[in-house]
UniProtKB/Swiss-Prot annotation:
InterPro entries, A to Z: Aminotransferase_I/II_large (IPR004839), AON_synthase_class-II (IPR050087), PyrdxlP-dep_Trfase (IPR015424), PyrdxlP-dep_Trfase_major (IPR015421), PyrdxlP-dep_Trfase_small (IPR015422)
GN (gene name): sptA
Catalytic activity annotation: L-serine + hexadecanoyl-CoA + H(+) = 3-oxosphinganine + CO2 + CoA
Superkingdom per UniProt: Eukaryota
Gene Ontology process terms (BP): ceramide biosynthetic process; sphingosine biosynthetic process
Species name: Dictyostelium discoideum
Membrane topology category: Single-pass membrane protein
Name listed for the protein in its UniProt record: Serine palmitoyltransferase 1
Swiss-Prot/TrEMBL keywords: Acyltransferase, Endoplasmic reticulum, Lipid metabolism, Membrane, Pyridoxal phosphate, Sphingolipid metabolism, Transferase, Transmembrane, Transmembrane helix
Length: 479
């Protein structure tokens, strides 16, 4: 009787809806009536009562169960990359590993300032005054006077209006890019950029286009491709991202041609100079000085204090608007503890030393030239390896010649190069393969990466060339 009354009421109100409602309301009310009828008439859900397994059946299922690995099995290269060398002591050009000294050509110490007595003394005094940490982000009690001093010094050195300081070199470029480029914007990236740049591009969630490394014809093709016209035309922000000196290849960007495109196609230029500041140019101010170009033509310029200035952290230079925007929107600036004050002091001192003693640059350029020419001369690498870097780069990549390379199996090439590295250690020379993470968009060909320092002596360079030659012949001619 109760259900009969409900149905009568539903029919009554349905009739009223039909009489009083307009067409859209009639449709909606009709759907509601059908849905109510469905809820009232559908059968209630009753879970099935499964039979309880016997002890024998449970044991059988357990025996048949095979767990899936929590992580995929490591390939031989991944296992090799997990091998660590523990450095017991670092002194000048040498490091101590397992109580044995090695000449270190694996560390980025371009101006030879690591363990410099003057910088060590400055750092020690800063620790006594400020402690070892800053106790907070820059916007929350983490700003110390030495941070502001370093920002002013960096802006002055780079000849830009202002600079902002980050506590991590990696986070500098990976925070700067997404702080400006957002969803809907366009980023055009050189395929040769290193991992931190790739991370920044990915975090931006912008539309990403790649052009072949240092290929200006391909860059122009992509720029034309992203020039929307007609009905598709709309105002979008467009960025081109490059490195001054590419860590993955030891080559430099053709900045003059890129700036011509910048004027023609109206994009903003982001350039990372982590490996060119303190290296290129007559006074070490980077790629802009190398080409005698005004730094302010680059909209956003980032760099590191670690490779040339023996410290930590990074910087971003630009107009006051560019710098101020990052103080509010740069994730690595806002949400990270600020750079330890003693590292800020050491970076400031290192820049001052470079300004006062440009001979450090002359020594670096001389050492790069001597090592490059020594390796490049006829017979030095026995026709087995080739240098893929430029003769002005402190980052020298040695790759297998195509005749010795197994292009179908990268792991074999990596293992072969690692044998050369291991053999060099037997002679007291520390080298390293160029190692990349699997998440990198474009992984360069396998290589041995050598880092040149200004404090290497001519005898050490000649010794290194002979060891590399000897180890290359021993490994590759026997394979």
């Amino acid at each position: 009787m109760f259900l009969f009354d409900i149905y009568n009421n539903i029919l009554y109100y349905t009739k009223e809806f039909i009489v009083t409602s307009t067409s859209p309301n009639l449709f909606i009310h009709g759907l509601m009536a059908v849905f109510i009828i469905y809820l009232l008439t559908k059968r209630p859900f009753k879970p099935r009562q499964n039979d309880t397994l016997t002890k024998a059946e449970e044991d059988e299922l357990i025996r048949e169960w095979s767990p899936i690995p929590l992580t995929p099995k490591s390939n031989p290269l991944e296992v090799l990359n997990q091998t660590e060398l523990i450095i017991q002591e670092s002194e000048g050009t040498h490091v101590t590993i397992n109580n044995k000294k090695y000449l270190n050509l694996a560390r980025s110490n371009y101006l030879g300032l690591i363990n410099n007595p003057e910088i060590n003394k400055i750092s020690e005094n800063a620790i006594r005054k400020y402690g070892v940490g800053s106790c907070g982000p820059r916007g929350f009690y983490g700003t110390i006077d030495v941070h502001l001093d370093l920002e002013k010094k960096t802006a002055s050195f780079m000849k830009t209006p202002e600079a902002v300081l980050y506590s991590s070199a990696y986070a500098t470029i990976s925070s700067a890019i997404p702080s400006f480029s957002k969803i809907g914007d366009i980023i055009i990236v050189d395929r040769g950029v290193s991992q931190p740049v790739q991370v920044g591009v990915s975090l931006s969630r912008s539309r990403i286009y790649y052009f072949n490394h240092n290929d200006m014809d391909d860059l122009q093709r992509v720029l034309e491709q992203t020039q929307f016209k007609g009905s598709k035309a709309k105002i979008v922000r467009k960025f081109v991202v490059i490195e001054g000196l590419y860590y993955n290849s030891g080559t430099i960007a053709p900045l003059p041609q890129i700036l011509k495109f910048k004027e023609q196609y109206k994009f903003r230029l982001i350039m990372d100079e982590s490996h060119s500041v303190g290296v290129l140019g007559s006074t070490g101010r980077g790629l802009t000085e190398h080409y005698n170009i005004d730094t302010n033509l680059v909209d956003i310029l980032t760099g590191s204090y670690g490779n040339s200035f023996s410290s930590g952290g990074g910087f971003c230079c630009g107009s006051p608007e560019v710098v101020y925007h990052q103080r509010l929107n740069g994730v690595g600036y806002v949400f990270s503890a600020s750079l330890p004050p003693f590292l800020a002091c050491s970076s400031t001192k290192a820049i001052e030393m470079l300004e006062e003693n440009p001979k450090m640059l002359e020594m670096l350029h001389s050492n790069i030239g001597e090592l490059y020419q020594g390796l490049n001369k006829s017979g030095a690498l026995n026709g087995l390896l080739e240098i893929t870097s430029l003769p002005i780069s402190p980052v020298i990549h040695l790759s297998l010649l195509d005749s010795k390379s197994n292009k179908s199996n990268r792991i074999n090439d990596e293992l072969l190069l690692q044998k050369i590295v291991d053999k060099a250690m037997d002679y007291g020379l520390l080298l390293t393969r160029a190692k990349y993470v699997s998440a990198e968009k474009f992984i360069p060909k396998p290589s041995i990466r050598i880092s040149v320092s200004s404090n290497l002596s001519s005898d050490q360079i000649k010794q290194s060339i002979e060891i590399i030659k000897k180890c290359t012949s021993f490994v590759l001619e026997s394979n």
